[in-house]
């Protein structure tokens, strides 16, 4: 399969991409990091995949590939910095900006499957963690809800 992973250089994305590449899927990683050496420091497993026809880095300066699946894990890390109101705005906008970009790039050639990662933080404490669970009212829940509403 031809797969675009947004946020493929992040914590979960690195593990996912490693697995997809091992399964011989054609993996495209969209990242906002423009410096390839920085990406390789974060995701050392990618060093062996450069030059492989099954792997490609994509950023704003590349043409987005035709793909069968988009997996969107993108967004600023919640754990990186202190959570202030400004930081929460950055976290939300980083996720919505990527969604808007993907919608624009793929509006005329939608993939068969679009997987959007969210978080269990959308649910109230002790709620059932699926689409039937009650939503929380904290900042994490508001971010998740805004993404899912998009």
Model-derived features: where do they sit?
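SDR active-site strand-loop-helix element
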Residues: 6, 30, 70-74, 114-120
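Conserved Rossmann-fold NAD(P)-dependent oxidoreductase catalytic core, especially the SDR/UDP-sugar
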Residues: 101-139
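Conserved glycine-rich Rossmann-like NAD(P)H-binding loop of the short-chain dehydrogenase/reductase
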Residues: 26-32
């Amino acid at each position: 399969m031809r797969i675009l992973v947004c946020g493929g250089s992040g914590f979960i994305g690195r593990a996912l991409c490693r697995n997809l590449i091992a399964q011989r899927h054609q993996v495209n990683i969209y990242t906002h990091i423009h410096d390839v050496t920085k990406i390789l420091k974060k995701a050392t497993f990618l060093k062996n995949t450069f030059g492989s026809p099954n792997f490609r880095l994509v950023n704003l300066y590349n043409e987005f590939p035709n793909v069968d699946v988009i997996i969107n894990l993108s967004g600023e890390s919640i754990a990186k910095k202190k959570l202030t109101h400004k930081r929460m705005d950055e976290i939300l906008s980083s996720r919505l900006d990527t969604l808007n970009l993907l919608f624009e790039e793929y509006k005329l050639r939608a993939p068969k499957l679009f997987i959007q990662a969210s978080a269990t933080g959308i649910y109230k404490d002790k709620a059932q963690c699926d689409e039937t669970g009650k939503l929380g009212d904290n900042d994490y829940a508001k971010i998740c809800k805004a993404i899912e509403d998009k």
